[in-house]
Design a protein with these regions (language model features):
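Short, flexible loop segments at the rims of nucleotide/cofactor-binding pockets, characterized by
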Residues: 19-23, 43-49, 69-73, 134-140, ...
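N-terminal/domain-start segments enriched in small and hydrophobic, helix-friendly residues
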Residues: 53-73, 77-79, 170-187
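Zn-dependent metallo-beta-lactamase
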Residues: 1-38
Length: 258
């Protein structure tokens, strides 16, 4: 796999990159470059870009001068942060508490990306959502279900890390099975161990589908980018179908915790 940059709109570019596990399996990763209404840019998540990709980003952003913020949305995605901060040291650096704890040598902004205070700073261009009913930062560092989801209003694009995955078979194989949107397989292990957690998760998903019902693109970290415009089913409908597929998991959790 080679890094590539997908132009979603005149304001949104999704950078598709490599992430290898044990040097063997490339599960991919991503970041997004977004132009704000004020003409400045932000990076959603951090990724160490190959030279040709960085040249494209720099050409769009006046050699990076117009990148005003690097916004880290997944608490367990930390590998590329120091490099991208070194590339654009003037950009304000935002993250979760885990980012700050793991990289205390960097100059972090005080507003955590999973906070209302942070969301208010960028509310003209984005909406953000944090899953309810699941651990945001799991004690088990192998469980990466939760992240802050971002919705760019102008391009109608959802940027999401591990929470959602979009699967599409390659080439002619895609005719054998329709693409589908699914929740990350670690959901059952990250639901909060308390009464009502499963129902809180259901309501969060339903709220998300309603609030972002106009979404036409979904960029997911370890899978693919989903483009839907004036097509059926909508992304909102696919989100609700994904919820239906995990209903047995939620019922099992309710039977155990209430």
């Amino acid at each position: 796999m080679t890094d590539k940059i997908l132009k979603i709109s005149d304001e949104f570019w999704n950078i598709r990159g490599e992430f290898n596990i044990f040097g063997l399996l490339n599960i991919g990763t991503h970041a997004s470059l977004v132009k704000r209404g004020n003409g400045k840019f932000v990076l959603l998540d951090a990724y160490e870009m190959q030279d040709d990709i960085k040249q494209q980003v720099d050409s769009l952003t006046n050699n990076g001068v117009n990148i005003e913020a690097i916004i880290n949305l997944h608490p367990f995605h930390t590998v590329h942060i120091e490099k991208i901060h070194g590339d654009y040291p003037h950009a304000k650096l935002y993250g979760t508490q885990r980012h700050i704890d793991k990289l205390p040598n960097l100059t972090w902004q005080t507003e955590l990306t999973n906070s209302n205070e942070f969301a208010a700073l960028f509310s003209e261009d984005f909406e953000f959502s944090v899953p309810r009913g699941v651990d945001f930062i799991s004690k088990n560092e192998h469980l990466h279900f939760s992240s802050v989801l971002a919705y760019h209003k102008e391009s109608k694009t959802i940027h999401v890390d591990d929470t959602f995955m979009y699967f599409q078979l390659p080439g002619l194989l895609r005719f054998l099975k329709s693409p589908e949107l699914a929740f990350h397989m670690t959901l059952s292990k990250t639901l909060e161990q308390r009464k009502g957690a499963a129902d809180d998760f259901r309501h969060w998903v339903a709220d998300l589908a309603e609030q972002w019902s106009g979404a036409e693109v979904l960029c997911a970290a370890h899978s693919s980018t989903l483009f839907i415009k004036n097509q059926s089913p909508s992304i909102a409908a696919m989100i609700m179908t994904a919820l239906e597929r995990v209903e047995l998991t939620l019922k099992h959790h309710e039977n155990k915790f209430g």
